[in-house]
C-alpha cells in the first residue's frame, strides 16, 4: 500500500508539472501565433502608444574630461500596453506572467540619443515580461558612454552638467508618447532613480541633482508631427581631495620655495637665480600634468592652470629682481656715481620704513690708526733728517697733542733738506693719499651693497604679499564655486 501511494503521488506531481508547462506553452502559442513584432500595438493608425519610462542608475563609472565622455551603468525600465497580448489567468490555469525573448515582441526602440560610441542599444537583450491584461514590461541593463561638455574653469573645484537623452529611434510624437513612471504613491518619478542599496558610489564624483524632463519638438511643417524625448540631467560635483593632496599641496610648497631666494645674500645673485629657475622648471612639470588631464579647449583656462601661470610669473619677476639686485650690489665708484636722492631713498628712507637699523658709524675708530701710522712715518723722517735719537723725538712729540708740533717742525726742516728727502716725503704723501682713496672707495662699495640689500628687502615683501594675496584670491574662486540651489530634490535621499 505504501509503495502504491508513493507512486500515485509521484505521477500526480509529474502530471501537474507537465500541465503547468503546457499552459505556458499554450499561452505562448495563443499570443504569438499570429503576432507581428513589426507592427505597433494600436487598433487604429491614428492611435498613440503610451510608453512609461524609468531610468535607474547603478553606477556612475567615470567622466573622462579629456574626451568629454560620461560612462554610466543603468537599468532602463520600459512599460507599455499591447492589446494583442491580452489574456486572463483564469483561462490558463492561473498563469499571470509570460517571459518571452525581446525579439518576439514589439519594442518602442528607446535609445540614448547623445551616445558617443554609436552603441544605441542595451548591453543585454533580456526577456520581456507579459502580464495579464496585455501589460508589457522590459528592464534591460545598459552601459552608456554619452557626451558631456566639460567646463574646466574651476578645475579641480568644479561641477559638471551632463545629460542622458532618450527618445524613440523610429516613431514620432504622434505614434509614441513618452511619460514618466509613477511610484507606489502615484507620484511621477521625474528624476533618475537611485537605489542606495545597489548603487556604487564613485570615488571622484558626487551626484547632487538628477532631474528629468519631457521635451516636445514641433515639426517643421504641418505634415511633420515632431518628436518627443526625455532628458535626464546629472549635476555632478567633483571630490577634490585627490587633486589637493597630489597636485595642489606639492605645487604650493614648491612655489613657496622661490621666496627662499631672498634669504641668500644680495651678492649671491647666481645662487638666487638658480633657485628661482629650478622652481620654474618644477612648475612647468605640474602644468604639463594638468594639460594631460583637461580637454584641449581654448574656451577657458582651469583654475589650477591659472595658479601655475601666476606662480611662474612671480618666479620670473623674482629672477629679474635677483639680476637687478646683483647689478646694484656689484657697482663701484669708478663705473657708477651715486646720486644724493638715490642714497636718501635706499639708505635712509627704505631702511626706516622696513624697520632696518643702519650700521653704526664710529668716525673715531679709523682716525687714531691713521694718525698713529702718520706719526710713525713722521718720526722716522725726523730721525733721518735731524739726526736726533728716536726716544728724544718721541718725548718731544708727546708734549704736543696728536703730533701737531712735530709735523710743523718737520715742515720747517724739510725746507732745507736735500732733494732726495723731498722725494721720500712725496712718496709718503702719495701713500697717504692712496690710503684715503681706498678707504673712500671701500665706503662707496659698502653703500652700494647696502642699497642692493635694501632693494632686495623691498622686493621680498612685495613678492610675499603678491604670492599670498594672489594664491588666496585664485583658490577662493574655486571655494565659492558651489552647485547652486536648484528647485529639485536631492538625487540620493539620505
UniProtKB/Swiss-Prot annotation:
Do you know which Pfam families this protein is assigned to?
Answer: Neur_chan_LBD, Neur_chan_memb
What membrane topology does the annotation report for this chain?
A: Multi-pass membrane protein
Q: Spell out where the chain is glycosylated.
A: 86, 161
Cytoplasmic topological domain: 265-272, 329-457
Q: Which UniProt keywords apply?
A: Cell membrane, Disulfide bond, Glycoprotein, Ion channel, Ion transport, Ligand-gated ion channel, Membrane, Postsynaptic cell membrane, Receptor, Signal, Synapse, Transmembrane, Transmembrane helix, Transport
Q: Name one GO molecular function term.
A: transmitter-gated monoatomic ion channel activity involved in regulation of postsynaptic membrane potential
Entry GO CC: acetylcholine-gated channel complex; neuromuscular junction; neuron projection; plasma membrane; postsynaptic membrane; postsynaptic specialization membrane; synapse
Q: What biological processes does GO assign it? A: acetylcholine receptor signaling pathway; chemical synaptic transmission; membrane depolarization; monoatomic cation transport; monoatomic ion transmembrane transport; regulation of membrane potential; skeletal muscle contraction
- Signal peptide boundaries: 1-20
- Reactions the enzyme catalyzes: K(+)(in) = K(+)(out); Na(+)(in) = Na(+)(out)
Give the stretches traversing the membrane: 240-264, 273-291, 307-328, 458-481
Extracellular topological segments: 21-239, 292-306, 482-494
Subcellular location(s) per record: Postsynaptic cell membrane; Cell membrane
- Which cysteines form disulfides? 148-162
Say what the protein does: After binding acetylcholine, the AChR responds by an extensive change in conformation that affects all subunits and leads to opening of an ion-conducting channel across the plasma membrane.
In which family does this protein belong, per the annotation? Answer: Belongs to the ligand-gated ion channel (TC 1.A.9) family. Acetylcholine receptor (TC 1.A.9.1) subfamily. Epsilon/CHRNE sub-subfamily.
| Subunit organization | Pentamer of two alpha chains, and one each of the beta, delta, and gamma (in immature muscle) or epsilon (in mature muscle) chains. The muscle heteropentamer composed of alpha-1, beta-1, delta, epsilon subunits interacts with the alpha-conotoxin ImII.
Q: What is this protein called?
A: Acetylcholine receptor subunit epsilon
State the organism of origin: Rattus norvegicus (Rat)
Q: State the gene name recorded for this protein.
A: Chrne
Amino acid at each position: 500500500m505504501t509503495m502504491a501511494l508513493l507512486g500515485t503521488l509521484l505521477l500526480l506531481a509529474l502530471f501537474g508539472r507537465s500541465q503547468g508547462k503546457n499552459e505556458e506553452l499554450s499561452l505562448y502559442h495563443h499570443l504569438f501565433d499570429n503576432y507581428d513584432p513589426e507592427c505597433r500595438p494600436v487598433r487604429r493608425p491614428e492611435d498613440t502608444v503610451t510608453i512609461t519610462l524609468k531610468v535607474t542608475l547603478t553606477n556612475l563609472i567615470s567622466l573622462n574630461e579629456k574626451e568629454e565622455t560620461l560612462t554610466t551603468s543603468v537599468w532602463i525600465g520600459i512599460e507599455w500596453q499591447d492589446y494583442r497580448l491580452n489574456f486572463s489567468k483564469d483561462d490558463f490555469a492561473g498563469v499571470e506572467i509570460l517571459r518571452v525573448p525581446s525579439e518576439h515582441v514589439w519594442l518602442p526602440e528607446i535609445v540614448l540619443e547623445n551616445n558617443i560610441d554609436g552603441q544605441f542599444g542595451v548591453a543585454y537583450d533580456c526577456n520581456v515580461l507579459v502580464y495579464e491584461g496585455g501589460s508589457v514590461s522590459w528592464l534591460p541593463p545598459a552601459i552608456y558612454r554619452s557626451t558631456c561638455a566639460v567646463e574646466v574653469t574651476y578645475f579641480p573645484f568644479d561641477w559638471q552638467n551632463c545629460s542622458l537623452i532618450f527618445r524613440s529611434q523610429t516613431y514620432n510624437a504622434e505614434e509614441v508618447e513618452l511619460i514618466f513612471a509613477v511610484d507606489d504613491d502615484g507620484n511621477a518619478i521625474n528624476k533618475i532613480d537611485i537605489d542606495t542599496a545597489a548603487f556604487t558610489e564613485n570615488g571622484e564624483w558626487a551626484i547632487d541633482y538628477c532631474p528629468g524632463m519631457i521635451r516636445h519638438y514641433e515639426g517643421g511643417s504641418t505634415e511633420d508631427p515632431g518628436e518627443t524625448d526625455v532628458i535626464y540631467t546629472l549635476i555632478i560635483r567633483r571630490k577634490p581631495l585627490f587633486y589637493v593632496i597630489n597636485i595642489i599641496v606639492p605645487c604650493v610648497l614648491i612655489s613657496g620655495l622661490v621666496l627662499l631666494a631672498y634669504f641668500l645674500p644680495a651678492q649671491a645673485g647666481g645662487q638666487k637665480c638658480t633657485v628661482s629657475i629650478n622652481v620654474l622648471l618644477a612648475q612647468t612639470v605640474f602644468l604639463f600634468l594638468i594639460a594631460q588631464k583637461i580637454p584641449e579647449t581654448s574656451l577657458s583656462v582651469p583654475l589650477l592652470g591659472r595658479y601655475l601661470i601666476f606662480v611662474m610669473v612671480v618666479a620670473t619677476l623674482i629672477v629679474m629682481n635677483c639680476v637687478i639686485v646683483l647689478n646694484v650690489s656689484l657697482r663701484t665708484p669708478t663705473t657708477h656715481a651715486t646720486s644724493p636722492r638715490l642714497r636718501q631713498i635706499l639708505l635712509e628712507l627704505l631702511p626706516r620704513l622696513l624697520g632696518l637699523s643702519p650700521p653704526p658709524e664710529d668716525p673715531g675708530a679709523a682716525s687714531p690708526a691713521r694718525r698713529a701710522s702718520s706719526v710713525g712715518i713722521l718720526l722716522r723722517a725726523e730721525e733721518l733728517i735731524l739726526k736726533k735719537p728716536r726716544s728724544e723725538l718721541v718725548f718731544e712729540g708727546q708734549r704736543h697733542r696728536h703730533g701737531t708740533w712735530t709735523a710743523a717742525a718737520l715742515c720747517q726742516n724739510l725746507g732745507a733738506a736735500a732733494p732726495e728727502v723731498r722725494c721720500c716725503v712725496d712718496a709718503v704723501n702719495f701713500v697717504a693719499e692712496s690710503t684715503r682713496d681706498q678707504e673712500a672707495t671701500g665706503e662707496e662699495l659698502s653703500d652700494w651693497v647696502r642699497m642692493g640689500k635694501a632693494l632686495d628687502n623691498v622686493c621680498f615683501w612685495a613678492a610675499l604679499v603678491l604670492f599670498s594675496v594672489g594664491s588666496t584670491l585664485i583658490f577662493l574662486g574655486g571655494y565659492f564655486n558651489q552647485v547652486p540651489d536648484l528647485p529639485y530634490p536631492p538625487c540620493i535621499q539620505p
